[in-house]
A protein has these predicted regions:
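NTP-dependent small-molecule kinase module
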Residues: 2-31, 54-56, 169-243
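Short glycine-/polar-rich loops that comprise or flank the Walker A/P-loop
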Residues: 64, 156-160, 202-205
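ATP-dependent small-molecule kinase phosphotransfer cores
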Residues: 62-153
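Hydrophobic anchor at the beta1->P-loop junction of P-loop NTPases
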Residues: 40
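Walker A (P-loop) phosphate-binding loop of P-loop NTPases
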Residues: 45
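Hydrophobic positions on the alpha1 helix immediately C-terminal to the Walker A/P-loop
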Residues: 51
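A glycine- and Lys/Arg-enriched "phosphate-lid" helix/loop adjacent to the NTP-binding pocket
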Residues: 126-194
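Conserved lysine of the Walker
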Residues: 48
Length: 243
């Protein structure tokens, strides 16, 4: 799969043009007892990893089975390659690294389906939305949002995306900012813009959370939202970004 070929593929372009149609039901009957698939997204250093862990601990403590998943999953062979790139140890072509990020999500798809079908709620630290936003923000010819989305067609669609919003000033004040490849102010601004576009396309399942407060304040906000999602009615699992 090449960037040029997919960028000109009209079916992918159509798939990326209307988020209201991005989620389609899997060919399985509704499972009222399935777990919820909740994704936390946001710019770097917005506190996603900390909040994901706190949410999993909270759900389990209240008798609702929950597990944490992170993308990239740096424990796999593919994840090890991604980690080397992010830590600036190796250089990888922009198209290739995007495909590796996507492959890292694909290799966990069956595990995610299994856990959800068993009634476990998954709290996911980054997902396909980050993959699209970070690559699209690079502005590389042939790697527009439609191409980026095409690589993840068929992955599980989350019940909700909770986006942790943080100002550039607050982001840079947080510890360790700048250690990884993408942690540059100008680039993070472009990532924000890319996320804004995804937010508009994923209306109804995307909630913006102010991450500028204390850790406990943000957690209380997230906890209420997650309670509503987990307790709410869930239809059959869907897939990204199909018509």
């Amino acid at each position: 799969m090449t960037a040029g070929a997919n960028a000109s593929n009209p079916s992918i372009a159509r798939s990326a043009s209307n988020a209201a149609s991005h989620v389609s039901a899997l060919d399985v009957p509704p499972q009222t007892s399935r777990g919820s698939l909740i994704v936390l997204e946001g710019v770097d250093r917005s506190g996603k990893s900390t909040q994901c862990k706190k949410l999993v601990d909270y759900l389990n403590s209240t008798g609702r089975p929950a597990s944490l998943m992170r993308f990239p999953d740096r424990t796999t062979t593919i994840g090890t390659m991604i980690n080397s790139y992010l830590s600036n140890s190796t250089e990888i072509d922009d198209g290739c690294i995007h495909l590796l990020f996507s492959a890292n999500r694909w290799e966990k798809k069956k595990e995610m389906e299994q856990r959800l079908s068993e009634g476990t709620t998954l709290i996911v630290d980054r997902y396909a939305f980050s993959g699209v936003a970070f690559t699209a923000a690079k502005g590389v010819q042939g790697m527009d949002r439609a191409w980026c989305m095409g690589c993840d067609v068929g992955l599980l669609a989350p019940d909700a995306v909770l986006f942790l919003s943080l100002s550039a000033e607050e982001q840079e004040r947080r510890g360790d900012f700048g250690e990884e490849r993408y942690e540059k102010r100008e680039f993070q601004a472009k990532v924000r813009e890319a996320f804004d576009g995804l937010k508009e396309e994923y209306k109804g399942r995307w909630e913006t959370v102010d991450a500028g407060g204390t850790m406990d304040e943000v957690f209380e906000d997230l906890k209420g939202r997650v309670d509503a999602i987990v307790q709410g009615h869930k239809g059959p699992l869907g897939r990204l970004w199909s018509m």
